């Protein structure tokens, strides 16, 4: 995978966490930059680790599915991207109580919940020629940056940008999956 695709993947994977961070920022009276960075670090580390776990699980199965690996990567990215696009149009609001402070465990649980798709992407990347360590680092750094910004913007922009970010992330994932398939099938020459 080329560096531009890696960059797009990294930011696409961070959009769920960005949307969650906007919600977390909206629950704070006045988000302080230290809380934003702390939240970004927690989410970023988790988001960097989950594609590694998925990649190792995918590599374990690679010898059995190498003939159709590109279809697996495409399908996983298509399903995840479509789910993100669908969720961006879901207008059902969830009523939740506002915490007085964000505990480490609350942030870690939220970070893990938003990184499940990164684990699936990691599994899909096991079937593609990619440096998983640099890809995971890019995902973690992008997530850290997006979450830090999301917490700070949470009070101001609320849930509207969260939905748009998820829509954009879903479209990017579908595009990356389509590119992987097109490259393997040599569609572009």
Swiss-Prot record:
UniProt subcellular location: Cell inner membrane
Protein name: Putative manganese efflux pump MntP
Main localization, broad class: membrane
Lineage: Bacteria, Pseudomonadati, Pseudomonadota, Betaproteobacteria, Burkholderiales
Gene Ontology cellular component annotations, sorted alphabetically: plasma membrane
Stated family: Belongs to the MntP (TC 9.B.29) family.
Membrane topology listed for this record: Multi-pass membrane protein
Family matches, as HAMAP family: MntP_pump
Species assigned in the record: Paraburkholderia phytofirmans (strain DSM 17436 / LMG 22146 / PsJN) (Burkholderia phytofirmans)
Physiological role: Probably functions as a manganese efflux pump.
Residues that span the membrane, as ranges: 3-23, 41-61, 62-82, 104-124, 132-152, 168-188
Domain of life, per lineage: Bacteria
Primary gene name: mntP
Alphabetical UniProt keywords: Cell inner membrane, Cell membrane, Ion transport, Manganese, Membrane, Transmembrane, Transmembrane helix, Transport
Listed InterPro entries: Mntp/YtaF, Put_MntP
Molecular function per GO: manganese ion transmembrane transporter activity
Annotated Pfam families: Mntp (PF02659)
NCBIfam families (UniProt xref): PRK11469.1
């Amino acid at each position: 995978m080329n560096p531009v695709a890696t960059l797009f993947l990294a930011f696409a994977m961070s959009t769920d966490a960005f949307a969650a961070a906007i919600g977390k920022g909206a629950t704070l009276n006045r988000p302080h930059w230290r809380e934003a960075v702390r939240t970004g670090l927690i989410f970023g580390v988790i988001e960097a680790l989950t594609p590694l776990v998925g990649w190792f699980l995918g590599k374990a199965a690679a010898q059995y599915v190498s003939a159709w690996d590109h279809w697996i990567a495409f399908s996983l990215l298509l399903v995840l991207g479509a789910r993100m696009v669908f969720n961006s149009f879901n207008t059902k609001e969830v009523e939740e109580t506002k915490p007085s402070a964000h505990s480490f465990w609350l942030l870690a649980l939220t970070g893990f919940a938003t990184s499940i798709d990164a684990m699936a992407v990691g599994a899909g990347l096991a079937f593609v020629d990619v440096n998983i360590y640099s890809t995971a680092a890019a995902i973690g750094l992008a997530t850290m940056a997006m979450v830090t910004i999301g917490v700070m913007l949470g009070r101001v922009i609320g849930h509207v940008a969260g939905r748009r970010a998820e829509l954009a992330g879903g479209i990017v994932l579908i595009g990356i999956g389509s590119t992987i398939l097109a490259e393997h099938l040599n569609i572009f020459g």
